Structures are given as C-alpha cells and as structure tokens.
Amino acid sequence: MLGHRPSGHANVSGTVRRFAVVASGVTPTNRRLLEAARGLGVSASLVQPANAAAWLRPGDVALGRLDVLPSLDGVEPGLYALRRLERAGIRVLNGPAALLAAHDKLTTAVQLGLAGLPHPRTVHVAEGRRPHLALPVVVKPRFGSWGRDVVACRSRLGLSHCLRRFRSRAWFRRQGALVQELIPARGRDLRIIVAGGEVVGAVERVAAAGEWRTNVALGGRRRAVDPPLDARLLAVAAAHSIGADLAGVDLLPDGSGGFVVLEVNGAVDFTDEYSLGGVPVFQRAVEALLAGGYAQADEEEAQAAGAHPSWARA
C-alpha cells in the first residue's frame, strides 16, 4: 500500500562520504536529519554556508536548509554558497534554484503553472496598482512564513484598506505583494513531506476556532494522516516542479474530492508525528535523499495500479 512501503533503500553508507546540512542554525529538524544519517552509518555534520566550500569535497552530499526570511537580502549569501558547492562537483540537494523558487511565492506560482498543477490564481501587485481578480482573495507577502501578514479580503473596500495598510510596510514597498484567489475555507489542509521524489510523511492541519488559517503558529492543530493517492501524486509533482529534493507541500481540499497546491516549502520543519507506516519520518527522508534522484516511487506504483490523478485529467 502506498505510504506503508517498508524502508528498503540500498545501503547508502558505502556510497556517501559525508552528509552535511548546510544551514545557519541547529534547529530540531536539522538535528534530527543529522541523527538519522548517522543512524544509517553516514558521517553527518551541520555546516555554516560560509564554511561549506572549504569543508566539503566531491563524494559528499550537501542538503541546503536556508532560513525563511522576509526578503532575499539574508538568503543570497547562502544561495551563493550552495552554487559554489555545485561548481566544485559536490552533490547539492535543495540547490540554489530550488530554494529560490520555494522562498519566493511568486516564482512558486509560476513554476506550478508551467507544470500544469492546480494552484490558486495569483497576481503580483505593487504600490499604485490594483489587482484584477474576482473576490474573495488573499493578500500575502512574496516572502516569509508562519501566516504573517496574510489577510483575507472579501470586499473591494476591504482589499483597498489592506493594500493601504501594507504601503507602510518596508517589504511591500520593496517587492509588492501577492493577491491570490481564496479557496473556500474548510478549516483543514494537508502538509506532505516529499524527499527524493517520495512521500515520506504527512499531517493534517486543523485551524483554531474562528481562524481560517491552519498554521500551528496561529493556534492550529495537527495530526498524523495517511494522505490519499491524489494528494501524494500532487505533492510529488509540486516538489518536482521547483526542483526541490526535500520540501513540505501544503495542499487544500478543493471541495470536489481533489486538492490544490497552496505552497511548496523548501525550509520545512517537521516532527516525528509526520511518520507514515511505522517508519520514522527522518530515517525515511534521509534514505530517500541519499538514494539519489527523483525515484517517484509513489507515481510508479500508482501507474502500475492504473491510477490517474484528477488534476492530470483536467
């Protein structure tokens, strides 16, 4: 059954010299990824972006885990460090192009559209320009996370007030905002962890009472879930569309039994509760990452079973 495939990747300890998480901080997720690699017999360390080129050599594997910031200003040095690793012949997972696409929600929207994947209609709006989308809409920054400065607007007056308020924000003056079709709130969504082209973990997130956003930072709750096949295939396709090796894909139910991609998170944090089928999510993620490439095991198994996702038939 999809999601309950036993952990069965080939032994990676003989093919990977060292595994490095390239990041500025030891977050719980980064620490658990390193522990999982060591549990597989692989030498693993956290490496600061500025030190990565001096520390890593061909035969090593580097996983880019750059912080989510409200602009590109603090991200560019990390992207440059990952680019240097690529040029040195080091295998980089979540490389600079993928992380940039995930960090910038406008680029994410473009890539999802080019891949033909379901995503809320999205336009970019800058100061002095009025968006042309049917109401209701969501206004959000191009960069950032945790639901900050994300506002639902259900009237033209509300939208005007929101944009007027955002004009005082430095981020809006620099990069504008996104105005996005509001998918009717159903109080829940899915976050699916994709690693190396495989679904390795998932939770359902439930919004707090009176809140339409499901972010845990805003009081939302989450519980482990085995996502349906359509959701799995869509999550793998969404991660692949931006070239992400490790990503958290947020899916909203569309009210017709299917899903739409809301966001693809390249710096996703997750916990043990995401585990599927009794296999620890961090072990499964590292195995899939070090196995290499986009195995797309879920898609291959689905094709063998004759499954055709609804969004691929649209």
Regions found by a protein language model. Name each.
Residues 2-4, 13-16, 97-178, 182, ...:
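Active-site nucleotide/adenylate-binding loops and adjacent lid/helix of ATP-dependent enzymes
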Residues 21-22, 195:
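Short hydrophobic segments within beta-strands
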Residues 147, 265-278:
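Glycine-rich phosphate/pyrophosphate-binding beta-alpha loops
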Residues 67-69, 143-144, 267:
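Short glycine-rich anion-binding loops that position phosphate/pyrophosphate groups of nucleotides
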Residues 137, 178, 200-201, 247, ...:
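Protein kinase-like catalytic core scaffold
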Residues 211-261, 282-302, 308-313:
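A long amphipathic alpha-helix within ATP-dependent nucleotide-binding catalytic cores
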Residues 24-121:
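Conserved N-proximal alpha/beta basic substrate-recognition cap immediately N-terminal to
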Residues 152-242:
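Phosphate-binding site of ATP-dependent enzymes
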